[in-house]
């Protein structure tokens, strides 16, 4: 059943992927809002999938499928937090394709049930995995902000207005997003 919810989330993230490609050529507030609502709905489906997976008895949190799913969910969560703070959807151009790809790979097939030895401190293992993937998600967002910063800086130095990337915010905003993501990502990695 968690795979069904994950596939619903994948369909919603597909709208975000289309937005990412559409935003490269022109900006549209209507399409941006539709993509944000679809991504929010996808996050709800994704969260339900992760909760059902967590409540099942045979879950292996360190598996590739679950790791990709968790990283995609946290990356989208960080994107939504950045959107709530800065009111810019430009990092979505990088984040949406990454989240879609990770969710797509995780939703391809049911994960095989692995027989593992009983872990005595299961709570510590889950906390460790969640903290590591939180750090990874923050670094994914920092990577996206860094790419956007380089593109915007090159555009401003060329002094040619380009309609292709006119949706990017000011360099200071992109720099703050990247810096704060790094500031959050590295401590969670350690």
What do these predicted regions represent?
Residues 1-57, 61-190:
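Polytopic transmembrane helical bundles with strong interfacial aromatic enrichment
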């Amino acid at each position: 059943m968690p795979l069904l919810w994950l596939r619903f989330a994948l369909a919603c993230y597909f709208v975000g992927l289309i937005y990412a490609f559409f935003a490269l050529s022109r900006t549209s507030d209507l399409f941006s809002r539709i993509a944000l609502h679809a991504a929010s709905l996808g996050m709800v489906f994704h969260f339900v999938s992760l909760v059902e997976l967590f409540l099942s008895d045979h879950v292996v949190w360190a598996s590739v499928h679950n790791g990709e799913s968790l990283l995609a969910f946290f990356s989208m969560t960080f994107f939504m937090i950045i959107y709530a703070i800065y009111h810019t959807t430009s990092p979505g151009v990088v984040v949406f394709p990454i989240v879609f790809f990770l969710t797509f790979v995780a939703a391809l097939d049911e994960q095989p049930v692995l027989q593992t030895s009983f872990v005595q401190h299961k709570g510590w293992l889950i906390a460790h995995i969640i903290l590591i993937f939180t750090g990874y998600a923050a670094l994914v967002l920092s990577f996206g902000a860094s790419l956007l910063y380089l593109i915007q800086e090159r555009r401003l130095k060329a002094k040619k207005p380009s309609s292709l990337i006119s949706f990017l915010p000011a360099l200071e905003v992109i720099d703050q997003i990247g810096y704060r993501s790094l500031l959050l990502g590295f401590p969670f990695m350690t």
